[in-house]
């Protein structure tokens, strides 16, 4: 099964609380980043996945593309740019 079809299937199966409104998948760790490391190692995920811990919380957000500010870019190969009037955005 191609990666896109597999990802769509997973998105349909997982309940919505696992995802946050900004488009990244919320991942629960143990406060030291180990939970996010285990998430990245599962299912041979690519090394390009970026994760962002949330301070002292056990939760963080992982993107399958690139994280830009609080959001995930919609495809690979994008750059994160900052516009003074709009904030962070992806340039693809």
UniProtKB/Swiss-Prot annotation:
PTM (free text): The homodimer contains 10 disulfide bonds.
Cysteine-cysteine disulfides: 63-72, 68-80, 73-90, 78-92
Tissue localization of expression: Expressed by the venom duct.
Range of residues in the leader sequence: 1-24
GO molecular function, one term: ion channel regulator activity
Protein's UniProt keywords contain Zinc: no
Primary subcellular site in the record, as a coarse category: secreted
Cellular component per GO, a single term: extracellular region
Highest taxon in the source lineage: Eukaryota
Compartments it resides in: Secreted
Domain notes: The cysteine framework is XX (C-CC-C-CC-C-C-C-C). Displays a mini-granulin fold, a structure composed of two short, stacked beta-hairpins connected by two parallel disulfide bonds. This newly described fold is derived from the same cysteine connectivity as knottins (ICK fold). The name 'mini-granulin fold' comes from the structural homology with the N-terminal region of the human granulin.
Quaternary structure (record): Homodimer; disulfide-linked.
Family statement drawn from the similarity comment of this UniProt entry: Belongs to the conotoxin D superfamily.
Function as written in the Swiss-Prot or TrEMBL entry: Alpha-conotoxins act on postsynaptic membranes, they bind to the nicotinic acetylcholine receptors (nAChR) and thus inhibit them. Through its two C-terminal domains, this homodimeric protein would bind to two nAChR allosteric sites, located outside the nAChR C-loop of the principal binding face and at the adjacent binding interface in a clockwise direction.
Name the UniProt record assigns to this protein: Alpha-conotoxin FrXXA 2
């Amino acid at each position: 099964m191609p990666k896109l079809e597999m990802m769509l299937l997973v998105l349909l199966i997982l309940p919505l609380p696992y995802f946050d409104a900004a488009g990244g998948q919320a991942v629960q760790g143990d406060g030291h980043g180990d939970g996010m490391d285990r998430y990245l190692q599962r299912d041979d995920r690519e090394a390009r996945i970026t994760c962002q811990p949330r301070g002292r919380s056990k939760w963080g957000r992982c993107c399958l593309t690139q994280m830009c500010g609080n959001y995930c870019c919609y495809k690979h190969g994008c750059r994160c740019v900052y516009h003074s009037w709009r904030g962070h955005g992806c340039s693809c």
